[in-house]
């Protein structure tokens, strides 16, 4: 493998591909909008699939639209897989998800140019509906792939704008024939921008992600009584917006009180009738709670529930909650995390251990194969925004760490145990 250790990706080419994909769904404010299974998503998929065909890989699509590009290995072994997603939020940036997919293609392109072979096949995955904006829950494609949701259930999920997941999948031509989970990887490594401020604030360039926060999403509907804003005394009001505002403050204070990695966000706030001189009769908000500790996440959920019950009693409000998504914290495979760290050291680059605060497809893949992630800095910690940015040298560096990590994994003999987090793995001394 001595010659393979000298391989490096072409950073200019990677940036070119990122810019080309960013033009699909581009908006005047500089953001990208490729909501899952829209025409823009289809065009993005078509572009990526055309690049896969150009690289000579086998392209396979499963029944929920997950795309896989597979480069042959010298032996009939499970593939080492990388990848991410290309769907975006409504005002997304150029890098979230797309960077991991395109860096994976650049790894294959680099190996092709060097006429390099690997024992294991190498795969690049493009997962469907990671963002969860148009279809709930998020990470839907990888969730189905990992066996967490049946295909039929996924197909029946309604879009926020009406049609079902299955209807839209067929409409854009990406309802594939392969059964989800048919390809079980030897390992999965996801390269991603941090989407947070830590690396940038510390002047770091790389993160080896060892775990990922658990996520609890709820929709809270608060109903009161609409009435005249000028004639209704404060003591006689049943104000839905007031109840929602109290909940916003409670979630904020709760997260600060629990401390540690606990965070809480009310990200959506809708008021009806939304008029200046009418007491709102209804408010619908979303609550996002996250923690790396499952017991503390459960505590936050219980305390929120108790608060809402008390609020309902005190203010005369009808309050209903609906679960949107719930994922437990994930601990990634520590052997792969160590390989990522060793690879960075081989490239003479500092790397720090990290936790992912955002949900990622890697957390679903960790259910079926050894998995870890690589982070590069997000300038200012900004993501899900047209201001989302990472320095080109960091994008190139992350892709080179991915290249060398994938090469080490693809040259291994032996079988990895899914879910092993203690570093125990039989690889015949090849790693």
Language model: regions and residue ranges:
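Acidic/His- and Gly-rich active-site-bordering loop/insert found
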Residues: 8-93
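Zn-dependent metallopeptidase/amidohydrolase metal-coordination segment
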Residues: 14-17, 22-27, 80-84, 350-401, ...
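Alpha-helical metal-binding/catalytic segments enriched in His/Glu/Asp
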Residues: 21, 82, 92-131, 216-222, ...
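A short beta-alpha structural unit
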Residues: 36, 267-274, 286-293, 318-337, ...
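Flexible, glycine/charged-enriched surface loops at secondary-structure junctions
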Residues: 60-62, 117-119, 176-181, 231, ...
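Acidic, glycine-rich active-site loops and adjacent beta-strand->loop/helix elements
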Residues: 67, 86-88, 122-133, 195, ...
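Midchain, well-structured core segments that form catalytic/ion-binding scaffolds
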Residues: 129-295
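His/Asp/Glu-rich mid-to-C-terminal helical/loop segments that flank catalytic regions of hydrolases
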Residues: 232-258, 301-306, 351, 376-431
């Amino acid at each position: 493998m001595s010659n393979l250790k000298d391989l490096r990706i072409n950073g200019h080419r990677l940036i070119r591909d990122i810019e080309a994909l960013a033009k699909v769904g581009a908006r005047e404010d500089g953001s990208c909008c490729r909501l899952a299974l829209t025409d823009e998503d289809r065009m993005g998929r078509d572009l990526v699939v055309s690049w896969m065909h150009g690289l000579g890989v086998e392209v396979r699509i499963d029944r929920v639209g997950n795309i896989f590009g597979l480069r042959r290995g010298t032996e009939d072994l499970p593939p080492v897989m990388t990848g991410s997603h290309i769907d975006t939020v409504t005002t997304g940036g150029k890098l979230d998800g797309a960077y991991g997919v395109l860096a994976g293609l650049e790894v294959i392109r680099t190996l092709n140019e060097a006429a390099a072979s690997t024992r294991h096949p190498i795969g690049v995955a493009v997962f469907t509906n990671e963002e969860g904006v148009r279809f709930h829950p998020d990470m839907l494609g990888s969730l189905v792939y990992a066996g967490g949701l049946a295909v039929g259930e996924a197909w029946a999920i309604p879009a926020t704008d009406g049609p079902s997941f299955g209807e839209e999948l067929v409409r854009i031509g990406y309802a594939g024939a392969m059964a989800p989970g048919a390809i079980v990887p030897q390992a999965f490594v996801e390269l991603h921008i941090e989407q947070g401020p830590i690396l940038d604030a510390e002047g770091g360039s790389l993160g080896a992600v060892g775990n990922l926060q658990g996520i609890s999403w709820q929709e809270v509907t608060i109903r009161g009584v609409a009435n005249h804003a000028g004639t209704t005394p404060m003591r006689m009001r049943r104000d839905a917006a007031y109840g929602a505002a109290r909940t916003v403050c409670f979630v904020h204070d709760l997260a600060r009180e629990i401390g540690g990695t606990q965070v809480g966000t009310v990200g959506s706030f809708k008021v009806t009738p939304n008029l200046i001189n009418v007491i709102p009769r209804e408010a619908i908000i979303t609550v996002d709670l996250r923690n790396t500790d499952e017991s503390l996440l459960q505590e936050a959920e219980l305390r929120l529930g108790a608060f809402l019950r008390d609020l309902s009693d005190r203010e005369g409000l009808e309050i209903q909650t609906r679960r949107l998504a719930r994922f437990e914290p994930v601990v990634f495979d520590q052997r792969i995390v160590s390989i990522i760290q060793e690879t960075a050291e081989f490239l003479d680059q500092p790397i720090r251990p990290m936790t992912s605060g955002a949900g990622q497809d890697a957390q679903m893949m960790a259910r079926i194969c050894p998995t870890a992630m690589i982070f590069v800095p997000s300038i200012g910690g900004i993501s899900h925004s047209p201001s989302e940015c990472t320095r080109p040298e960091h994008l190139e560096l992350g892709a080179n760490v991915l290249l060398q990590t994938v090469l080490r994994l693809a040259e291994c003999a032996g079988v990895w145990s899914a879910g092993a987090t203690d570093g125990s793995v039989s690889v015949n001394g090849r790693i």
